[in-house]
Amino acid sequence: MLDIRLIRKEPKECESRLQKKDPAISLERLLDLDKTVRQLKADSEALLAKRKVLSGQIHKAKVANENADALIQEVNTIADQLVAFETTLQEQEALLEDLMARLPNYPDEDVPVSPDKTGNQVIKGHGEVPTFPFPPKHHMQLNEALQILDFKLPAKTTGSGWPAYCNEGVLLEWALLTYLLNKQQAHGFQLWLPPLLVKRDILFGSGQIPKFDGQYYRVEDGDQSLFLIPTAEVVLNGFHSQEILNEQDLPLCYAAFTPCFRREAGAGGAHERGLVRVHQFHKVEMFAFTTPEQEEVVYQKMLHVVEEILSELQLPYQLSLLSTGDMSFTAKKTIDAEVWLPGQKAFYEVSSISKCGDFQARRSETRYRDAQGKLHFVNTLNGSGLATPRLLVAILENYQQADGSVVIPSVLRPYMNNQEILLPKTVR
């Protein structure tokens, strides 16, 4: 949520900044509504003040045994007016709040302006894109012999886009997750296994609704709806909603492992088959609450963790600064870590590290008290640390051998009983 006071003070500047994300944004309707709401409040306060004066006059008239019928009639008229004002005020405030809730976060000044991902800027590359002395296979082709993933059986039970891991695929997935969690803990992140369902107001607080309403799986629990989380960011942000934290306790750096649920899987087209885009996947998510002064230090810490993981896995990757048209609704700055997928012949995002400023904190009402006792909204940051499906794809495709086997990265072997290679089923 943005600060309405800044919008009132600098409407043209705010509109210009927002249009870098969405050129269609106009603040005219919002400003008109804000003016109407403030006028209604002023008129209501004036009527309340007048009623107070009249009530005093009625009291004096009664004490003096004077006729107060006209005064009483005027007070009754004011009461009716106040009821009408309150109804109108509630309606107008609801419209204003909805418009405010649909405005995205302002992008930082150093974010490239572009309507889409074509404006993203590669700011760092690491490792060489592999060349193979044989025709490299897509991970789905490798899986035909390895048999570590199954798409047919879960399609019967659940539908397309819901893969199942099997055999050594289960071990490799858990090896990855254990390695990722150990890495987060080593860097000082507090580990969590949070709930997978959240209330609607928690989705609102993290910025998922109202803009993306209807894109999340919902579970009915009596008269209450709960939502399956699209990322642990949602629930971690909600942990401290409507709280006042102490400045000396910041930053709070959390890392959570959860399954994540996305309804839009498959939107990338048939070429993104397999694990590249699915409805359910595992992810380790980093999340932090900071002061504005701590924000950049924690941001660099998150970037460092992601780069360390990809470097230790010896995967070729690049860092891309996202343009305004490719950033999320809540982010003011995002850097994507992208790994090379030989099967796609392209770099694919495995982690997004974002600064959100006080945008989520305003929606969630999360503040901190400084040493002087003054209250401020916290800043929030989030970063994938990391999502495993594409990471698994990257390992399978970059570590593949001519015979269809796949070498297991050395950092994962301790979590797989020191197994060094995945062999095709026919040679086991």
Swiss-Prot record:
GO terms for cellular component: cytoplasm. It catalyses: tRNA(Ser) + L-serine + ATP = L-seryl-tRNA(Ser) + AMP + diphosphate + H(+); tRNA(Sec) + L-serine + ATP = L-seryl-tRNA(Sec) + AMP + diphosphate + H(+). Signal peptide: none annotated. Keywords: Aminoacyl-tRNA synthetase, ATP-binding, Cytoplasm, Ligase, Nucleotide-binding, Protein biosynthesis. It comes from the Bacteria. The keyword Aminoacyl-tRNA synthetase applies. It is an enzyme of class 6 (ligase). L-serine binds at T231, A232, E233, E285, S384. One of its GO terms (molecular function) is ATP binding. Pathway: Aminoacyl-tRNA biosynthesis; selenocysteinyl-tRNA(Sec) biosynthesis; L-seryl-tRNA(Sec) from L-serine and tRNA(Sec): step 1/1. Coiled coil: none annotated. ATP binds at R262, R263, E264, V278, E349, V350, S351, S352. Its EC number is 6.1.1.11. It is found in: Cytoplasm. GO terms for biological process: selenocysteine biosynthetic process; seryl-tRNA aminoacylation. Catalyzes the attachment of serine to tRNA(Ser). Is also able to aminoacylate tRNA(Sec) with serine, to form the misacylated tRNA L-seryl-tRNA(Sec), which will be further converted into selenocysteinyl-tRNA(Sec). PANTHER family: SERINE--TRNA LIGASE, SERYL-TRNA SYNTHETASE. Consists of two distinct domains, a catalytic core and a N-terminal extension that is involved in tRNA binding. Belongs to the class-II aminoacyl-tRNA synthetase family. Type-1 seryl-tRNA synthetase subfamily. Homodimer. The tRNA molecule binds across the dimer. This is Serine--tRNA ligase. It comes from Chlamydia trachomatis serovar D (strain ATCC VR-885 / DSM 19411 / UW-3/Cx). The gene is serS.
